[in-house]
Amino acid sequence: MTTPLTLENISQAPKALLHDHLDGGLRPSTVLELAGQYGYDDLPADDVDELATFFRTAAHSGSLVRYLEPFAHTVGVMQTAEALHRVAFECVEDLAGDNVVYAEVRFAPELHIEGGMGLDAVVDAVLAGFADGEKAAASAGRTITVRCLVTAMRHAARSREIAELAIRFRDRGVVGFDIAGAEAGYPPTRHLDAFEYMRGNNARFTIHAGEAFGLPSIHEAIAFCGADRLGHGVRIVDDITVAPDGQVKLGRLAAILRDKRIPLELCPSSNVQTGAVASIAEHPFDLLARTRFRVTVNTDNRLMSDTSMSQEMLRLVEAFGYGWSDLARFTINAMKSSFIPFDERLALIDDVIKPRYAVLAG
């Protein structure tokens, strides 16, 4: 018998997560405790519930710029090795609790050196937190693999340095590189040197593109930068037309994105909150899925968006009527698109994801 698609049941399904920001996923209680421990005095509230409400309200601003402002507070309490280790450990713990079996969690090392740490020490602390979190999850009966993407800020000028950091740590848990931050005025082509360095070292990278800015950002990310994946990429819908009879026509950019199987790291709730789309029901996720783009489901920022992978999946189920086979396909899409070796991807798909979804589907 098919298992009902409730939040409780969806939480039991295995999940693969490609787009999750470490500094966007802290527990409100941890933000408060770290602020007190390290003397960070700029928090807008000193109560856990009030602080959670602050982050949630800011997320629902309808603006990417406003959505990003509260990160000053999470980054502000992540300036020591101990704090970074704790946040990374709890990230793994929370994801494992939601039955995420594979995750690539990204963060920008350059934002965590205000306390005097070097970039290498920052990455060391995060990777140690991930490793210890994996061990603790396994001891609790929840196996999870977490890998890291190091991110450069697109408005800054350290992208080549961060790309070199990715290569230095490529055998220790860093599987790729990313650029993030406000898109408008900061095109991905400002960082060609970093992307060329990654390609020259046979390394993988994703680019935040097509979230708050339109098709030119996606075009540059694909045509000039050579992105392996797109962070968000939701504005590709601007290159797709749907006729009154339902026939879908792809523009040249949309067609190459689909035909090359370039994965889209879609983050439905975040896209609504930043104003990229009006509602989950109006999100182009379903159009892209039906048109056979390689779509994946992601959280973006679990604290700011007050979300989880299970909640993101449930919202899509409620909006578009998806079944277990659809959720399995989106999960397999993500696993296929991950930056770990092929045999590791295949093992998780064949040994974990497919069997567990088969049980849920009945």
Curated annotation (Swiss-Prot):
The active site is at residue 211. Signal peptide: none annotated. It catalyses: adenosine + H2O + H(+) = inosine + NH4(+); 2'-deoxyadenosine + H2O + H(+) = 2'-deoxyinosine + NH4(+). GO terms for biological process: adenosine catabolic process; hypoxanthine salvage; inosine biosynthetic process; nucleotide metabolic process; purine ribonucleoside monophosphate biosynthetic process. SUPFAM superfamilies: Metallo-dependent hydrolases. Binds 1 zinc ion per subunit. One of its GO terms (molecular function) is zinc ion binding. Its EC number is 3.5.4.4. Zn(2+) binds at residues 19, 21, 208, 300. Substrate binds at residues 21, 23, 181. One of its GO terms (cellular component) is cytosol. Keywords: Hydrolase, Metal-binding, Nucleotide metabolism, Zinc. It is an enzyme of class 3 (hydrolase). The keyword Metal-binding applies. PANTHER family: ADENOSINE DEAMINASE. Belongs to the metallo-dependent hydrolases superfamily. Adenosine and AMP deaminases family. Adenosine deaminase subfamily. Catalyzes the hydrolytic deamination of adenosine and 2-deoxyadenosine. This is Adenosine deaminase. It comes from Mycobacterium sp. (strain KMS).
